[in-house]
Amino acid sequence: MQSWVEVSLNTPAQLSLPLYLPDDETFASFWPGDNASLLAALQNVLRQEHSGYIYLWAREGAGRSHLLHAACAELSQRGDAVGYVPLDKRTWFVPEVLDGMEHLSLVCIDNIECVAGDELWEMAIFDLYNRILESGKTRLLITGDRPPRQLNLGLPDLASRLDWGQIYKLQPLSDEDKLQALQLRARLRGFELPEDVGRFLLKRLDREMRTLFMTLDQLDHASITAQRKLTIPFVKEILKL
């Protein structure tokens, strides 16, 4: 079952924000497929002692949030202060949550497309970007569902800033890579996913990775409860296929 870790974010601006991140979304659990260069770039930015910026885009469900969670986990394990701002949940907080984040080691802004056209949020992100440039110490990772110039932002200067750094498209996984990703997730959870069962899932289910991972978790729980190994007949029974 998925569990969560809490990361405390503290800044000199007296902001205290608890971050709850899934503890299984790390670099070790990310199957790169054709994204090896992207993964290397992310890890290089995290290793360096000065600021760095990467913009990562892909359709929803491709693994954008996984990589940001992994980056937060890696630096927080080193004792560094990190900030993760999921803009698809922006109703939970206000733009002022970004105040003081230039003092953190890492800031991750997820799903920036969700605030396109929102003047307050766009200005808050633009101001944070400029403060990070001035500080020269904070790493900034931003994700969106399209390249910066296609975000339909109301603030042209923000679109220009987002277009400055390293920009990567997260490439979708092939079916073979999806099978490897499923088997990796299974191994990390302490069980084996037979190849024939994995190929059956890819053939019969929606191939979006989030759906596949949720199904794998369901099958893991069912297998433990029934004390049965994962076989195609058992999978058919559980999923009613």
Swiss-Prot record:
The encoding gene is hda
InterPro entries from the UniProt entry:
Chromosome_initiator_DnaA-like, DnaA_dom, Hda, Hda_Enterobact, Hda_lid, P-loop_NTPase
Q: What is this protein called?
A: DnaA regulatory inactivator Hda
> Is Protease among this UniProt entry's keywords?
no
Mention one GO biological process in which this protein takes part, according to its record.
Answer: negative regulation of DNA-templated DNA replication initiation
Q: Which NCBIfam families match?
A: DnaA_homol_Hda, PRK08084.1
Q: Which UniProt keywords apply?
A: DNA replication, DNA replication inhibitor
The organism's place on the tree of life at top rank: Bacteria
